[in-house]
Amino acid sequence: MRCPYCTGESAVIDTRELDNGETIRRRRRCKHCDRRFTTYERVESVNVMVVKKNGDREPYDREKLLRGLRVAAYKRPISADVIDTLVTEVEAALIAYDALEVPSSVIGEQVMERLRSLDEVAYIRFASVYRSFSDLGKLREAVEELMEKE
């Protein structure tokens, strides 16, 4: 595999199974620049169309969900492996949904359900984008709802 920093060849220095053997995590070292990076291998199994709020349809994109979660978890004590596991759990729920099309609301609720117990700040950050809070009052309501459920 090519190094993402210098495009040199890399060597695998560590391999581990994650998610009960569904994912393989590999640590690699570039033979040219000596930098290290991580790659993941998994079977691409979620083949559904996501129905957006406005009715548009687009293919499910794991990377898009990962990006959204990374933004929500920015500077929070949540590792990349935990975020990856959360996305894998959401994908398992999508497979169990057993439909060719899944509303984006199903994905959003699955993520929020898991984030709530993982990290409250990341939950509020994700909810503020997912639920499109239009003002501070809506954000306050979400925080109060979260505090009531404790």
Swiss-Prot record:
Determine the domain of life of the protein's source: Bacteria
The protein's GO terms of the molecular function aspect are: ATP binding; DNA binding; zinc ion binding
Q: Which GO terms describe its biological process?
A: negative regulation of DNA-templated transcription
Q: Where are the zinc fingers (unnamed)?
A: 3-33
**Which coenzymes or cofactors are required?**
Zn(2+)
Residues in domain ATP-cone? 48-138
Q: Which UniProt keywords apply?
A: ATP-binding, DNA-binding, Metal-binding, Nucleotide-binding, Repressor, Transcription, Transcription regulation, Zinc, Zinc-finger
What function does the entry list? Negatively regulates transcription of bacterial ribonucleotide reductase nrd genes and operons by binding to NrdR-boxes.
Database matches in NCBIfam families: transcriptional regulator NrdR
Q: Which family does it belong to?
A: Belongs to the NrdR family.
Supply the HAMAP family for this chain.
NrdR
Spell out the protein name for this chain. Answer: Transcriptional repressor NrdR
Please tell me the species this chain comes from: Herpetosiphon aurantiacus (strain ATCC 23779 / DSM 785 / 114-95)
What taxonomic classification does the UniProt entry list for its organism?
Bacteria, Bacillati, Chloroflexota, Chloroflexia, Herpetosiphonales
Task: Name the gene behind this protein.
Answer: nrdR
